[in-house]
């Protein structure tokens, strides 16, 4: 099983590449790698990024977004990795702007996926907050690849376009016994400052 850290966004709202922002003395991407490594669950951690940032990452393989689909958001990153590593039975996808992710949350989501993958033939299992799916903290089956490819060819390359066309299910973030905001995106500098307090 492989993990994909999505780190190719423009970070316009944040003002600088979020992957290299720091929390607790580690860059966001390093923090996520540390959590993923600690689980002994993934045989490879891959960073999906763009040509500009690719050489800046250390400690993980980097796959640059496919040239024909660059600048098409998270789907482009997932597609670019899946296309090269189609043999993997499952991919865990995490956005780099979610640096507070915990091993406990990932383990619980994995258990949910395993329990439902055969009976419900799930292709995507992720978290949701209330009624809002969080497709950038989710497990994806390689069966999603053709649907992602079609979405990227269309003029709607939103994550919703994919998960509404696949067998997907979501568990609420409140089901994880953890009172931190481990699932929160850091979109603005003030988001990071509020976490550091």
From Swiss-Prot:
Positions bound to GTP: 6-8, 18, 65, 97
PANTHER family named among the record's database cross-references: MOLYBDENUM COFACTOR GUANYLYLTRANSFERASE (PTHR19136:SF81)
Essential cofactor(s): Mg(2+)
Keywords: Cytoplasm, GTP-binding, Magnesium, Metal-binding, Molybdenum cofactor biosynthesis, Nucleotide-binding, Transferase
Disulphides: none
The keyword Nucleotide-binding appears for this protein: yes
UniProt function note: Transfers a GMP moiety from GTP to Mo-molybdopterin (Mo-MPT) cofactor (Moco or molybdenum cofactor) to form Mo-molybdopterin guanine dinucleotide (Mo-MGD) cofactor.
Protein name per the record: Probable molybdenum cofactor guanylyltransferase
Classification via InterPro entries: MobA-like_NTP_Trfase (IPR025877), Molybde_CF_guanTrfase (IPR013482), Nucleotide-diphossugar_trans (IPR029044)
Domain comment quoted from the record: The N-terminal domain determines nucleotide recognition and specific binding, while the C-terminal domain determines the specific binding to the target protein.
Family: Belongs to the MobA family.
Any single Gene Ontology cellular-component annotation: cytoplasm
Molecular function via GO: GTP binding; metal ion binding; molybdenum cofactor guanylyltransferase activity
HAMAP family assigned to the protein according to its UniProt record, in alphabetical order: MobA (MF_00316)
Catalytic activity reported: Mo-molybdopterin + GTP + H(+) = Mo-molybdopterin guanine dinucleotide + diphosphate
Designated gene of the protein: mobA
Compartmental location: Cytoplasm
Cited CDD domains: MobA
Binding positions for Mg(2+) per the UniProt entry: 97
Keyword Cell membrane assigned: no
Documented EC number(s): 2.7.7.77
UniProt xrefs under Gene3D superfamilies: Spore Coat Polysaccharide Biosynthesis Protein SpsA, Chain A
């Amino acid at each position: 099983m492989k993990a994909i850290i999505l780190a190719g966004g423009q970070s316009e709202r944040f003002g600088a590449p979020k992957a290299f922002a720091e929390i607790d003395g580690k860059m966001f991407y390093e923090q996520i790698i540390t959590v993923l490594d600690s689980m002994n669950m993934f045989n490879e951690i891959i960073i999906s990024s763009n040509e500009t940032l690719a050489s800046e990452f250390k400690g993980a393989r980097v796959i640059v977004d496919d040239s024909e689909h660059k600048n098409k958001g998270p789907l482009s990153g997932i597609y670019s990795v899946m296309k090269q590593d189609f043999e993997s039975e499952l991919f865990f996808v995490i956005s780099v702007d979610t640096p507070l992710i915990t091993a406990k949350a990932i383990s619980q989501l994995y258990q949910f996926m395993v329990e439902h993958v055969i009976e419900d033939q799930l292709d995507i299992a992720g978290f949701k907050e209330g009624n809002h799916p969080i497709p950038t903290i989710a497990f994806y089956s390689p069966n999603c690849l053709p649907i992602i490819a079609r979405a990227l060819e269309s003029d709607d390359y939103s994550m919703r376009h994919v998960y509404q066309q696949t067998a997907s299910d979501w568990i609420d973030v409140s089901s994880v016994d953890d009172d931190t905001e481990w699932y929160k995106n850091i979109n603005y500098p003030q988001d990071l400052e509020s976490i550091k307090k």
